From Swiss-Prot:
This is Conotoxin PnMKLT1-0122. The keyword Transmembrane helix does not apply. GO terms for cellular component: extracellular region. Residues 23-49 form a propeptide. The lineage of its organism: Eukaryota, Metazoa, Spiralia, Lophotrochozoa, Mollusca.
């Protein structure tokens, strides 16, 4: 019984958190999914594509952050 109540409270809390942190609370999850769908249709708009480091800029060897080439010491080549 206690576990069931805790699960219900957790689900309600997570649902409220999702709607409270949404950019437009009226659309909630619908807005989130429409953005993801748009990024799938147009991969250039994806945020993941914008995180890479350009040529000769400082990079992170462990995370492979260079757009093209390799990260040697501290710069992308």
């Amino acid at each position: 019984m206690k576990l069931t109540c805790m699960m219900i409270v957790a689900v309600l809390f997570l649902t409220a958190w999702t709607f409270a942190t949404a950019e437009d609370p009226r659309n909630g999850l619908e807005n989130l999914f429409s953005k993801a769908h748009h990024e799938m249709k147009n991969p250039e708009d994806s945020k993941l594509n914008k995180r890479c480091v350009k040529y000769l800029d400082p990079c992170d060897m462990l995370r492979h952050t260079c757009c093209f080439g390799l990260c040697v010491l501290i710069a992308c080549i």
